[in-house]
UniProtKB/Swiss-Prot annotation:
This is Methionine--tRNA ligase. The keyword NAD does not apply. The gene is metG. It is found in: Cytoplasm. Belongs to the class-I aminoacyl-tRNA synthetase family. MetG type 2B subfamily. It comes from the Bacteria. One of its GO terms (molecular function) is methionine-tRNA ligase activity. It catalyses: tRNA(Met) + L-methionine + ATP = L-methionyl-tRNA(Met) + AMP + diphosphate. One of its GO terms (biological process) is methionyl-tRNA aminoacylation.
Length: 515
């Protein structure tokens, strides 16, 4: 039976600097979504990569006295290393400087020409190098320092040049129909409202080529023009599936189920991209989900300001799964969030070390001591036993619904509510007292606790994969019985030998406490 296909992408990162926590946040979240759907039985294709053209790359390379290609090669290797360090399960890594991508971008350009949507004209307007975007005069302001800024707070300069244009104005009604008929196309709702209002206010044709630099994909038939970065960058999502070869087996993954992006690029993904695809007569993605920004103790981070946090250092300091868990649990996905050392330590120690780690350690140590290191044979289940087992099953359904809406924090919330309840169950049943008064009942309580831990272990795999694997290993859950379908289908068998219990989640101890 062929499994349902699921295609998910991150935005491609711009490698004119080093990776920062914002890049890591998007990759971790998207990786969890990809892993979740794989465990859910889907045939998943997960893409990430780097967007290597444009004037910022050229300027950064010149500053260092190297070519843009050398800069791209060097910095992209740091982004690839980040994907490895974060344990990302991406199926492909695309670079827009690759040959396959030149071909795809030129073919989609020609398809838009064939549809009558590209023409040559002259362009004059306010351009932000940092955003790689043009802004209307009304979207800019001159501040006290005498500099004119665009809506993202970046400086803009007046640019005049010959340019090719895309007839974006012709797509206004089609786009409004798209948003109207597919309310889930842009999420969360605040982003949808912003985009609808932007499109309703009237769309101007879009300048889609430049002649002032040459680090980019040449326009077919007019080589002195290179494609404006957004035609080139957005096309990466179909390049990776073999476009323009629609007989490529990967093409079956299109249209994408979800493009996961930062909210600062929602206009490009929710307005320009569907318009380009309509023009090229290609199917549209099902969803564009724009997440919020991460603030370091409430301060916005940016490469230009220089308060950028290195994700490699965070993993080194707190542990990978601890960082993954914190970012997905603490911040409602789609909203802005803040992080600090204290917040990461509190989440790690309270949820992972105390609630989940401690429960596993206590219950499995009791089994090792009192049940010959084997899963106990349970007796008849009491109401309390059934209630906690049922809550674990219900959490899977809640998590599935939450993940359909990219609500990672709600999925984790439901799973960790089971962990909290399992701790109350364990404390209330007092298996250490039952050891003397009712050893058979003690065995049932320990069985139920271990079985709840197995179900939780399966459900947390997308979020904290290495730790979940350790937990499932010490519960002797067979390696081929760890899909979501196994939560109910493959309960622990009484009499199974368990390995010696190992701590799964160490507490975070401050350096000065260790000395």
């Amino acid at each position: 039976m062929s499994r349902e296909k699921y295609y998910i992408t991150t935005a491609i990162a711009y490698p004119n600097g080093k990776p920062h926590i914002g890049h890591a946040y998007e990759l971790i979240a998207t990786d969890a979504m990809a892993r979740f759907q794989r465990l859910n039985g889907m045939d998943v294709y997960f893409l990430t990569g780097t967007d290597e053209h444009g004037i910022k790359m050229l300027q950064s390379a010149r500053k260092e006295g190297i070519t843009p290609r050398e800069l791209a090669d060097r910095n992209t290797s740091a982004f690839r290393r980040m994907a490895e360090v974060l344990n990302s399960s991406n199926d492909d890594y695309i670079r827009t400087s690759e040959e396959r991508h030149y071909k795809a971008s030129q073919v989609i350009w020609q398809a838009m020409v064939a549809n009558g949507d590209i023409y040559k004209g002259g362009y004059a307007g306010w351009y932000s190098v940092r955003d790689e975007a043009y802004y209307g005069e009304e979207e800019t302001e001159v501040r006290a320092d005498g500099v004119r800024y665009g809506p993202q707070g970046t400086p803009v300069e007046w640019v005049e040049e010959e340019s090719y244009f895309f007839r974006l104005s012709a797509y206004q009604d089609k786009l409004l129909d798209l948003y109207e008929n597919n309310p889930g196309f842009i999420m969360p709702a605040e982003r949808r409202n912003e985009i609808v209002s932007f499109v309703k206010s009237g769309l101007k044709d879009l300048s889609i080529s430049r002649t002032t630099f040459d680090w980019g994909i040449p326009v077919p038939g007019d080589e002195k023009h290179v494609m404006y970065v957004w035609v080139d960058a957005l096309t990466n999502y179909i390049t990776a599936l073999g476009y323009p070869d629609t007989t490529d087996e990967r093409w079956a993954y299109w249209p994408a189920n979800a493009h996961i992006i930062g909210k600062d690029i929602s206009r490009f993904h929710a307005v320009y991209w569907p318009a380009f695809l309509m023009s090229a007569q290609l199917p549209l993605p099902k969803r564009v989900f724009a997440h919020g920004f991460l603030f370091n103790r409430g301060e916005k981070m940016s490469k230009s300001v220089g308060n950028v946090i290195d994700p490699f250092e965070l993993v080194e300091r707190y542990g990978l799964d601890q960082l993954r868990y914190f970012l997905m649990r603490e911040v409602p996905f789609g909203q802005d969030g803040s992080y600090s050392h204290e917040a990461i330590v509190n989440r790690t120690n309270a949820d992972l070390a105390n609630d989940l780690g401690n429960l596993a350690q206590r219950s499995l140590s009791m089994i090792a001591k009192n049940c010959e290191g084997k899963v106990p044979q349970p007796g008849a289940f009491s109401e309390a036993d059934k209630a906690i087992l049922d809550q674990a099953d219900a959490a899977l359904e809640t998590a599935r619904k939450a993940m359909d809406d990219q609500a990672l924090h709600l999925a984790l919330g439901a799973i960790f509510a089971v962990v909290a309840e399992a701790n109350r169950y364990f404390a209330g049943q007092e298996p250490w007292a039952l050891r003397k008064t009712d050893p058979a009942r003690m065995g049932t309580v320990l069985y139920v606790t271990a079985e709840v831990l197995r179900r939780v272990g399966i459900m947390v795999q997308p979020f904290i994969p290495q730790s979940a694997e350790k937990l499932l290993d010490i519960l002797a859950a067979p390696a081929d019985k760890r899909q979501f379908a196994d939560v109910l289908a493959s309960p622990l068998a009484g009499g199974t030998d368990l390995p010696a219990p190992q701590p799964v989640f160490p507490r975070y101890v401050e350096a000065d406490e260790q000395n």
